[in-house]
Amino acid sequence: MPHYLVPQPKTVVDGEGKLKGKLYLADKRFSHLKLFPTRGKIKINFAYDGELFNEYQIEITAKGVSIVGKKDVSIQYALTTLYQLVKQYGNELPCMRIEDAPQNQHRAIQICTGQVCVDYKKEWFQKLIFNMALLKATHLYLYFEMDYPFLCLPHYRRKGQMTQADIKELIALADTYHITVVPCINVLGHCGDFLSYQIHNDFKEYDENTQNPRYSFSSSLCTHSEKVREMVKNMIEEICDLFPSDIIHVGGDEVDLIGKCPNCAPDRGEYGKNGVYLQYFRYINSLLKERGKKMGIWADEVLIMEPECRFWNFRKHECSPDKFKQDMEIVNELRDNTIFYDWFYNGASRLTQEFFHKHGLQFIACSSTFTCYMTSPSLGQGYAEHALYSTAEELGAMGMLTTDWINQIGLHAELGWFPLASGLALNWCGCGEKFCKNHTLDEFLQAYSFQAYGIEDESLIEYLRYAGDFESELLSAFPPQLRGLAIRKMVFSTTNPLTFSMLYSPYLKGDAFNDYKNRVAKLEELFSKIDLKKQDEYFFINKIALICHQALVKRYEKIDLALTEYDKAAKAQPHDKKAFKKGLTVAAKLIRSHKKDLCEAMQFAKRCSLVFGLENSPVLRLEKTLKNIDKLADFILSMKDGHRLLPTFNRIAKFLFSTPENSYWENGSYDWMREHPSYLAFDEDNNPAPAAPIGFASETKYINYP
């Protein structure tokens, strides 16, 4: 039987016999870890050896267990390994010798509490820290964006937000497990939430040539504004006061506007876009350096200036290659006190990593759970992490970070534990040819399934692979853009009960729908086979894919049956009033019957808000969907008086639940303009620029305006 250990130790040598009896840990220095009882039959003995070649070693014989470690954290790592063995074997441990050491010293995950603003749930974060300790993590990055309780911005708070007391308590808890909490804020881009309030309108960047700042919107702060610099200085002072971490991550990624306003434009003309950006972060770095902190910054805006990298290829219109030498002088100033976080979520990124290696810059390679693009996690993301981290190791990265993003519409970080754990396993073990040096991805998945949920078979893995892998039988029938997040959005984001049919019907024609229905039945069967050995109040989130697909099968089936009856009614309308009315009655009844199919989705959405602190919009949208189902049924019944020819479902989807936008007119719009007030609709044009080139004649020639 394989040892289900995550991460897998460097060497495990099995011995003869078993150690029988309940282990206990008498030393109070480690009682706070809550890994072992303080009383039992067999005492866990440990000793320190600062000259030990590895981080720790464990010896289990028929007579007892002994641990040797370099320091306290080494003993903790050994105890977490021993804890996992006891979880698997109980009070009959097989004899063995374990020697272990980490490949990388910076082993991190990021949890996103900003971006749609997740309420703080103390119990979940306590479990998070414990799980991270079991996986031998060193750093927890908390991504606040601007959703942080700044004392300097007392007006900018929200209910449910982490308080400073919450943060202090979490830092203290993490410290007992030798985990450093790193704050992640944004001091330039990704400030759209902050800038959506009129009180902050003067803080934004804008394009002087194309925008009026009184009416324009930007998600970027102005780099030269005195108000911005004073605010950012106060923010950084507060963060430095509260967090012991030697790294403060200040964002800096995906900046939509830089150097376009009157304050910034002169410097952009002289130094270029990159120069304005780098000079601003030179200022930020100076603030942090004064406080003895290192600046963490996302790497994409810096990498734009490198012609070989992917960011340059995508955004070369923003680059100033002629100013590369000048830009690099500032980068070199930042060298000793800055860590560049090089993010890429789809696999290898050798070119960007070579940029940092070539210039002697400190960098951390960042992958992602990728769950924000999915309905269920793809277990194959472990291969993408491996591809990124293996070249990062080769090129001297400080370590690795697996990120979690955008927790909303039924998604929470809890759903991303497999890719979070696989990233930490790769960090500890180091990268082998295909996955970790010490085990394959399949071996990791089986071990983590057991350690996280007590599941000894492959039932959970089979369910998640079927639900989330892009090439699975369940998803491969749909085009890529409709396989991931789109499924989740169809249930928890759209409120139009016809949208799924409009988008997915090309791929569900004929027998294709029955095939999809059978695949969803298989998904249900796979979920039913999951043998959860212990109660876990958070496990329910793994059911999201099944809940979504079941609801969508029912939706498509009932809408399609209703459309069949509606079509019969349309054909009978000119000559058979009885058949006409009957068809509409049956169609409306079928549509209304879909309401009960959304009960489980509604319960799931409410539970996510209660347990994980997710925003409540999925509940609100589902409530509106239920109303729109009634609205659709009522509208169909209102047509029984024959006051107009029946519009197609496509036109109903367009007019009944939203306002169509069109440059001139929307086909069929005249009937909707004369409808009953409950259903009256008309198209609009909120972007009244010409739909085609304009030309007019002068006395001598035609002048064409593009």
Predicted regions and their residues:
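Feature activates predominantly on carbohydrate-active enzymes
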Residues: 2-11, 52-57, 61-296, 364-367, ...
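A short acidic, often aromatic-flanked loop/helix-cap motif at beta-alpha or helix-coil junctions
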Residues: 50-51, 117, 348, 373
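Structural motif
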Residues: 42-43, 64-66, 107, 338-339, ...
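Short, well-ordered secondary-structure micro-motifs within conserved domains or adaptor modules
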Residues: 21-68
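Short secondary-structure boundary segments
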Residues: 48, 144, 404
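Substrate-binding groove of N-acetylhexosamine-processing glycoside hydrolases
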Residues: 2-35, 169-172, 178, 226-237, ...
